[in-house]
Amino acid sequence: MHIRHLGLVDYEPTWHAMQAFTETRTGETPDELWIVEHPPVYTLGLAGKPEHLLQQTAIPLVKTDRGGQITYHGPGQLVVYLLMDLRRRDYGVRDMVRRIEQAIIDTLADYGIEARGDVNAPGVYVGARKIASLGLRIKNHATYHGLSLNVSMDLAPFGWINPCGYAGLEVTRMTDLGVEATLAQVAERLIPHLETRLARPQHETEA
């Protein structure tokens, strides 16, 4: 799996680059993880309802093709896009979501944070507060989009939406939980957990 550290990049061109990568990939194209950070932007998934944006702000809103509802991206949030061919694995998208969640939970545990998933609401939570979101798109058995983990970002813009379509859902970040770490440091811990949790079945890797 190739790891690409792209730094601070605008959302829309990155999304279109993911689409292009997925459209042109072949059976030989290596899977990739794109590690990014975005300037402030709201993204509205395929199931998203505009009324979940509670007030107009200067933050742009992009209607995108991932699953899910509305969320916010901004500086201080670690975003990982997963461009993977599911035909190389023995699991489907639901299991993939659980594996991604567990990789995030494993990463937070490295920092002494106890987190959990929720079978009824994808993402990762600390208590009742959401710390990470997931949203994927599957096309021709290939995935794109991915996860976002709140590290040190300004959480105020979440107050102007119903995060992931849930009114009153509270969010949190690693700095509020006593962790002072850069995005690069958190990515360094998260990537190995993702690689482990998303690994091919053992019988395939031995071939």
UniProtKB/Swiss-Prot annotation:
Subcellular location(s) per record: Cytoplasm
Keyword DNA-binding: no
GO biological process: protein modification process
Keywords for the protein's UniProt record, in alphabetical order: Acyltransferase, Cytoplasm, Transferase
Alphabetical list of InterPro entries matching this protein: aa-tRNA-synth_II/BPL/LPL, BPL_LPL_catalytic, Octanoyltransferase, Octanoyltransferase_CS
Protein residues bound to substrate: R66, G67, G68, Q69, I70, T71, Y72, H73, S133, L134, G135, G146, L147, S148
Note in the entry: In the reaction, the free carboxyl group of octanoic acid is attached via an amide linkage to the epsilon-amino group of a specific lysine residue of lipoyl domains of lipoate-dependent enzymes.
Protein name: Octanoyltransferase
Source organism (scientific name): Laribacter hongkongensis (strain HLHK9)
